[in-house]
Amino acid sequence: MTFQSDIEIARAANKLPIQEIGARLGIPSGDLIPYGHDKAKVSQGFIRGLADRPDGKLILVTAINPTPAGEGKTTTTVGLGDGLNRIGKRAVICIREASLGPNFGMKGGAAGGGRSQVVPMEDMNLHFTGDFHAITSAHNLLSAMIDNHIYWGNDLGLDARRITWRRVMDMNDRALRDMVVNLGGVSNGFPRQTGFDITVASEVMAILCLAEDLEDLERRLGGIVVGYRRDRSPVFCRDLKADGAMAVLLKDAMQPNLVQTIENNPAFVHGGPFANIAHGCNSVIATRTALKLADYVVTEAGFGADLGAEKFFDIKCRKAGLKPSAAVVVATVRALKMNGGVAREDLGREDVAALKRGCANLGRHIANVKGFGVPVVVAINHFTTDTEAEIEAVRAYAAGQGAEAILCRHWADGSAGIEDLARKVVQLAETPSMFAPLYPDEMPLFEKMETVARRIYHAHDVIADHVIRDQLRAWEDAGYGALPVCMAKTQYSFTTDAAIRGAPEGHSVPIREVRLSAGAGFVVAICGEIRTMPGLPREPAAEVIRLNGEGRIEGLF
């Protein structure tokens, strides 16, 4: 059989007009705003009309700590949605939009892979419906209005040394992390130090993903703290009168995007915060809409369960009042071997001993998910290099942790390769879920960070200097103490050191910086060396992406 790349499989898909996909969910064509023939936005009016409908079951797909290439979490999300439909269940998937940064960097796209993809794959991995452009524009409009306000007299008394709002762009570019703006003389303004973050780390992105409707969106935008006066009192976005214009830029972006899988099942793709430097979940409005339209909604949270799942439970579910019915932890033989000490270039060779060592990582994630009171099953995402002995070792280990591990071949076989997992998920979803967040709202902010570090990462302590602790206390005094925390750290390890694999115990978590996302409604703790503006690798994926002689894209995966 001839090997087909993801892009070749996606191009060969027999896509249906998006109106037919909408009709399957009961969405009238008049409530779809089409972007071409195969993607559309769903109108706010239609979504408002769903309020009184009962909710379906919410299924989270998460994973172990990944290799740099990822472990097929989105592929499994898509495959599981297709699998549930295959066994006669009405299912919808909800995933995030792709960022250009990793597309042209090292990780690749975010549309799934093989026979478990969302299409149109090329559009999704590039500009899609323009949501990221709108988010970037809204964010940078506020940035421009801050410097403009200072230029024209600074009536609000903003201290240029204490402006916390940076700029963003949807690209990995380490050169923009720190810079001085307004150089060039009096006509250009007052020089000050600032920098860029990647769009997926923007508070505007988080706000769009957590807002319930346009009114809530504008309220949250107005609540953004852009900086402080000399007396340390905050200056808000609404003080600059930027919130209305920002909401206008985001009006269409707030409408969820409807597309389809290769097997013509519906998929909402909306929002895209990273899980290592942001909260890592698709939009609340897309998830809630899907829950009103389907019996089962399958969604994913970025990277491993220590990041994406924890934030899904402690931020998204807490804020939106969602109650997941079951969780799937995706594991691959190769990632378990890497966690057991095998070098990346040797992952294709059988090594049961290393795999068993690496299974401690899987066990930690299973225990963490169970700690939230959610039933869990393990999906072994099959790779051609996996051996029967390795697969059986994973099954045996998971069984010892009280979770069934099911081999899934959805990448190669689509929904036919994941039926067993689909049936298990239905079974789990019928059992009582005792979901509860990790910590109460009233716990002090630093204690929340300690709770995540100790219970999820198994750290011994959290290191933060007096400046950070004083800042957290000041935010508590200002009324932000009930907010959840968003831990920004490497995705490759339970520690803040990407090189430490497995399931380490007793390490320290250093907090380098804290940021208040008052509009989004959480406090970010930046741990270790993680950056909110990534850089490109030595050999970025962009080097092999091109147009062929027929004007078709090559190299996008």
Curated annotation (Swiss-Prot):
<keyword id="KW-0547">Nucleotide-binding</keyword>
<comment type="pathway">
    <text>One-carbon metabolism; tetrahydrofolate interconversion.</text>
</comment>
<dbReference type="GO" id="GO:0005524">
    <property type="term" value="F:ATP binding"/>
</dbReference>
<dbReference type="GO" id="GO:0004329">
    <property type="term" value="F:formate-tetrahydrofolate ligase activity"/>
</dbReference>
<keyword id="KW-0554">One-carbon metabolism</keyword>
<keyword id="KW-0436">Ligase</keyword>
<dbReference type="InterPro" id="IPR027417">
    <property type="entry name" value="P-loop_NTPase"/>
</dbReference>
<dbReference type="GO" id="GO:0035999">
    <property type="term" value="P:tetrahydrofolate interconversion"/>
</dbReference>
<dbReference type="Pfam" id="PF01268">
    <property type="entry name" value="FTHFS"/>
</dbReference>
<comment type="similarity">
    <text>Belongs to the formate--tetrahydrofolate ligase family.</text>
</comment>
<feature type="binding site">
    <location>
        <begin position="67"/>
        <end position="74"/>
    </location>
    <ligand>
        <name>ATP</name>
    </ligand>
</feature>
<dbReference type="InterPro" id="IPR020628">
    <property type="entry name" value="Formate_THF_ligase_CS"/>
</dbReference>
<protein>
    <recommendedName>
        <fullName>Formate--tetrahydrofolate ligase</fullName>
        <ecNumber>6.3.4.3</ecNumber>
    </recommendedName>
</protein>
<dbReference type="InterPro" id="IPR000559">
    <property type="entry name" value="Formate_THF_ligase"/>
</dbReference>
<keyword id="KW-0067">ATP-binding</keyword>
